[in-house]
């Protein structure tokens, strides 16, 4: 089998590091880009170069932006008393897509993990405590993933914020809309039973 030239192989290897792309998918993507250089590859390379120099973290919340403050933090119509804490920007974007939250966000940049040696100082937890003190936050909503590390992080944050007196809530967990009980794991069913409400 013929090997691709070294620079193309390097591009394939780099593409394969992206989530959802394995070596075969990366190879197909690179071949498509090479086939459509003018329409796909050149504009993609230019956009990536621009984003590499302009993208940065919002100094207030940690969202990705190309200014000091992101559009959400600059939006004066957002509720200033509600702060939704998320693990990463992808979670923030998912909540924004849903359109159900009109407050502000705080992106941690990960979760606590003894296995990966990630402690509170590696995350934006100290900055979260500062924001609660300085911005007059009345409610912190913990929208962290229902993993062991996510729940450990949620409990840690609740303990850190307890002296401030701020109300700390978390997202409900349970049966997804359209979900069938037979297909759900025991933990999800248990969480749904514990979070039940009057019908």
Curated annotation (Swiss-Prot):
<dbReference type="GO" id="GO:0006310">
    <property type="term" value="P:DNA recombination"/>
</dbReference>
<dbReference type="InterPro" id="IPR023627">
    <property type="entry name" value="Rcmb_RecR"/>
</dbReference>
<dbReference type="InterPro" id="IPR000093">
    <property type="entry name" value="DNA_Rcmb_RecR"/>
</dbReference>
<dbReference type="Pfam" id="PF02132">
    <property type="entry name" value="RecR_ZnF"/>
</dbReference>
<dbReference type="Pfam" id="PF13662">
    <property type="entry name" value="Toprim_4"/>
</dbReference>
<dbReference type="Pfam" id="PF21175">
    <property type="entry name" value="RecR_C"/>
</dbReference>
<dbReference type="Pfam" id="PF21176">
    <property type="entry name" value="RecR_HhH"/>
</dbReference>
<keyword id="KW-0479">Metal-binding</keyword>
<dbReference type="GO" id="GO:0003677">
    <property type="term" value="F:DNA binding"/>
</dbReference>
<dbReference type="GO" id="GO:0008270">
    <property type="term" value="F:zinc ion binding"/>
</dbReference>
<feature type="domain" description="Toprim">
    <location>
        <begin position="81"/>
        <end position="176"/>
    </location>
</feature>
<dbReference type="InterPro" id="IPR006171">
    <property type="entry name" value="TOPRIM_dom"/>
</dbReference>
<protein>
    <recommendedName>
        <fullName>Recombination protein RecR</fullName>
    </recommendedName>
</protein>
<keyword id="KW-0227">DNA damage</keyword>
<comment type="similarity">
    <text>Belongs to the RecR family.</text>
</comment>
<keyword id="KW-0233">DNA recombination</keyword>
<dbReference type="GO" id="GO:0006281">
    <property type="term" value="P:DNA repair"/>
</dbReference>
<keyword id="KW-0863">Zinc-finger</keyword>
<keyword id="KW-0862">Zinc</keyword>
<comment type="function">
    <text>May play a role in DNA repair. It seems to be involved in an RecBC-independent recombinational process of DNA repair. It may act with RecF and RecO.</text>
</comment>
<keyword id="KW-0234">DNA repair</keyword>
<dbReference type="InterPro" id="IPR015967">
    <property type="entry name" value="Rcmb_RecR_Znf"/>
</dbReference>
<feature type="zinc finger region" description="C4-type">
    <location>
        <begin position="58"/>
        <end position="73"/>
    </location>
</feature>
<dbReference type="InterPro" id="IPR034137">
    <property type="entry name" value="TOPRIM_RecR"/>
</dbReference>
